[in-house]
């Protein structure tokens, strides 16, 4: 997929326009993402693991494997006018999936797939050409960047934000978090956050500018849909061009830094280790 950073519709490159999707083409395509869309074109993505709260995984049927493809399908569908991203139950992504099974023998063998999925995951999230609202329904302790890269971030009062999948788990934070968090928190606080496994509570995240609103759980989704309806009333081209200008620097930085970060993350995995020693 060709990415261009100067145009108003940066990710609607020729390859995407030529392969436009219809909602029915991908509505039931994914094992870890439930998709619905209302008549206004507001698409709701609910991440889950086997129907329950989402758990992070890297198997071939995991969120890591599917989200990049889902974001690209959404980007290719011209009927999508807003996207709401949320979790299931009372957590966004709070833990890893202990029930995963992998086709590869070790991390070194798995890395080529993880590398490609990692490139697609955040580049394709930022490639969605319409505004995105994150409704963070609980702790976002693993890959919280999925939520905070959205244009509007709403969170319930018991939500927390952390990056426990990388340095605290023995992995290099090279799959985009090294770009996202120093941008949002500032260079020093961002590095502190990544190196220490700090958990930032919802109200503190709002004070830091990471979250736009903190809400009671019962008000989270109604508020997300109210904001989506408000924005969806605008002309389509206003929505798309606004998304383009608001994400331009994020897209540029991610395109420039993600592959390099993944290379460093992969180099740290060259020593063969069992999959349960990630």
Whereabouts are the PLM-identified features?
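Conserved CoA-thioester-binding segment of acyl-CoA-metabolizing enzymes
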Residues: 8-86
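Glycine- (often His-adjacent) and acidic-residue-rich active-site loop
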Residues: 51, 59, 79, 86-120, ...
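Catalytic-core regions built around general acid/base machinery
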Residues: 70, 117-129
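Short, active-site-adjacent cap segments at secondary-structure transitions
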Residues: 90-94, 141-142, 246-249
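CoA-thioester-processing core
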Residues: 121, 125, 140-194, 223, ...
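Short, well-ordered beta-strand core segments
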Residues: 132, 139, 153-154, 214
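Acidic, divalent-metal-coordinating active-site segment for phosphoryl/phosphodiester hydrolysis
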Residues: 141-143, 197-204
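C-terminal long alpha-helix characteristic of the crotonase
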Residues: 154-159, 211-258
């Amino acid at each position: 997929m060709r990415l261009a950073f100067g145009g108003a519709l940066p990710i609607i490159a020729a390859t995407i326009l030529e392969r436009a999707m219809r909602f029915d083409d991908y509505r039931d395509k994914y094992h870890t993402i439930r998709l619905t869309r209302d008549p206004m074109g507001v698409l709701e993505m609910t991440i889950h693991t086997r129907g329950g709260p989402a758990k992070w995984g890297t198997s071939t049927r995991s969120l890591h494997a599917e989200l990049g493809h889902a974001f690209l399908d959404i980007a290719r569908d011209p009927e999508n006018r807003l996207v709401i991203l949320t979790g299931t139950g009372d957590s966004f992504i709070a833990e890893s999936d202990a029930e995963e099974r992998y086709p590869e023998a070790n991390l070194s063998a798995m890395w080529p797939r993880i590398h490609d999925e990692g490139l697609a995951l955040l580049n394709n999230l930022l490639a969605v050409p319409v505004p995105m609202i994150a409704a963070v329904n609980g702790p976002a302790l693993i890959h919280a960047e999925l939520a905070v890269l959205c244009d509007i971030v709403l969170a319930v009062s018991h939500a927390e934000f952390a990056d426990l999948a990388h340095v605290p788990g023995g992995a290099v934070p090279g799959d985009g978090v090294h770009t996202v968090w120093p941008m949002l928190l500032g260079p020093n606080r961002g590095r502190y956050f990544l190196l220490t496994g700090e958990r930032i509570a919802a109200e503190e995240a709002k004070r830091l500018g990471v979250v736009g609103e903190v809400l009671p759980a019962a008000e989270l989704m109604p508020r997300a849909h109210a904001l989506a309806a408000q924005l969806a009333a605008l002309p389509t081209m206003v929505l798309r061009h606004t998304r383009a200008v608001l994400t331009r620097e994020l897209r540029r930085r991610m395109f420039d830094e993600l592959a390099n970060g993944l290379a460093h993350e992969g180099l740290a995995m060259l020593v063969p280790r069992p999959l349960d020693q990630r």
